[in-house]
Amino acid sequence: SGLDEAGWLAPSAAEGWSISDVMLHLAQSEEAVVSSVTGAQISLLDSIPVVGDTVDEIMENRVRAERGDPFVIFERWRTARRASVAALRNADPDARFPWAAAPLRPQAMATTRLAEHWAHALDIAEPLGVDYPDTDRLRHIAWLAHRTLPYGFGLAGDQPQPIYCELEAPSGDTWTYGDPAAPA
């Protein structure tokens, strides 16, 4: 990684979390994928009580419960990431596995992992002054964002409705999601 201990313990852009805390959160979420898909417990995560009223509060409490040596946490993330990729690759593509908002198929769960890693990479790169340019790989995150709009509407207490999105990709290409006849 190239970071020394001071770098790992520096504040991230995720309020209240160090860069090491962000990596711990990512490690925990990858371990949760493995647990969901395979039923195997690969960490102590399942033994940490679920405390909080929202996903954010639960994640905050889990990070707080497991803070530790940043170099160990980074290796934990690497191990969990490899296990998560293997679990999703080997899963029945039509099966649905429990996840935060609703059961997901492996492809959708993998896309959520891309989105979470992208968002948290920004939390890490920005405070370190590392350039993190947008690329057309963001299309997966755009797809996920459109796909989860009904969930977002529901959380806000609004009735989900079809929405058409037309986005300009970093390359200048146009990405479209939804029915063009739906409101934009």
Report each predicted region and the residues it spans:
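Short, helix-capping/interhelical loops that line the mouth of catalytic, cofactor-
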Residues: 31-89
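Low-complexity, glycine/alanine/valine/leucine- and proline-rich hydrophobic stretches
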Residues: 164-184
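Hydrophobic, proline/glycine-rich low-complexity stretches
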Residues: 1-6
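Internal, conserved structured core segments that host functional sites
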Residues: 67-119
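Short, contiguous alpha-helical
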Residues: 9-50, 99-156
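Short secondary-structure transition/capping segments
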Residues: 50-62, 90, 135-148, 178-183
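Short, conserved, surface-exposed binding loops centered on an aromatic residue
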Residues: 153-159, 166-167
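Conserved active-site beta-strand-loop modules that form the wall/rim of enzyme catalytic pockets
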Residues: 116-117, 162-165
